[in-house]
Amino acid sequence: TPALRSILSQTFLRCKTAQIAFNIDIQYADFNFIAFPDIYSIFENPLDNAVTACSDIHSTELNKEINLKIVRKNNIIGIDIRNTRENSILIKNGCIQSTKTDPNGHGMGIKNMKRAIQQYDGFITINYDENIFHVSMTIPISKI
């Protein structure tokens, strides 16, 4: 879809400027059944956060890397985004909080992602460890 192409192009340019490896494996890309604003919630927010997290890596021992994989298995679309990180994860009331210095316009991204995915009867899981942040989303195609 044009919206996804635009998001990926912008992310690629930001990664190139910040010397971040951006690895893309797209095996399925028909998102025409998803509304334009929801495409941005589903893709732009986690990729923007990934670029920010990688840009904040100062360790020479950790590669700055973002991996995006989109697959279809039977009637399920799987979206997997992983990035390296060394920034802190701020949790408040069981929710991940924005750590961006300007709080205006920030802090709604993960909520909007969850809302968009759930609107299409999908699921989202977020996991992280010391050096990896991982967002996994599934959307059933039967919702079309």
Q: Where are these predicted regions, by residue range?
A:
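Glycine-rich/acidic phosphate-handling loop/turn and adjacent ATP-lid/helix
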Residues: 75-107
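Conserved ATP-binding N-box helix of the HATPase_c
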Residues: 36-61, 115, 119
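Short beta-to-alpha transition helix within the HATPase_c
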Residues: 1-18
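Conserved short strand/loop->alpha-helix "switch" segment adjacent to the catalytic nucleotide/phosphoryl-transfer site
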Residues: 22-43
